[in-house]
Amino acid sequence: MNEKEIEKLISEQFLCRIAFKGENQPYIAPFQYVVVDGSLYFHFTNYGKKMSFFKQGTPVCVEIERYTPNLSEYEFVVLSGNLELVENHQERKRAIMKMAEVGRKQLSPNFLVAHGFPQGSDWSEFTDDQPVLIIRLDDVKEKTGLKSP
């Protein structure tokens, strides 16, 4: 895939997988993401294996894909880089607002449980007033894309 195709796939999707370097084996988990000003942002809950791996500060791989059910058409991108906690209030707010917008349009409110919200929550509750951890992919060292012929 060329750079334009890679960027198109990244901008059109909203779910990815992040692979972390675990202690004895890799660890992979799904995440909602958004693109704001050319950067990828993810929401992390403040618990689970991913947090201990994130705190280690080791490089990660992010995988984004699109495919048809029979795999006659597919495309995927892998990005290698580092994850950084977003502490700037305005940057964090922009990422949260975009995640909530994507969530309202394309995801069930049930998905908010994966974000650490109680069942029955609504996307209007996903705001920068909440203790939501926003993580940015930084220092992207490699982008690889592959698509069906």
What name fits each language-model region?
Residues 46, 57-66, 75-84:
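Active-site-adjacent structural patch at catalytic or cofactor/ligand-binding sites
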Residues 13-46, 63:
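Short beta-strand segments
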Residues 21, 67, 121-123:
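Short, solvent-exposed loop/turn elements at beta->coil junctions and helix N-caps
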Residues 45-49, 100:
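Short, solvent-exposed aromatic-acidic interface loops
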Residues 36, 45, 65, 84-86, ...:
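Solvent-exposed residues in well-ordered beta-strands and their adjoining turns
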Residues 1-17:
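Short, basic/aromatic recognition patches
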Residues 71-149:
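Charged, gly/pro-rich active-site loop segments
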Residues 51-55:
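Surface-exposed connector loops and short turns at secondary-structure junctions
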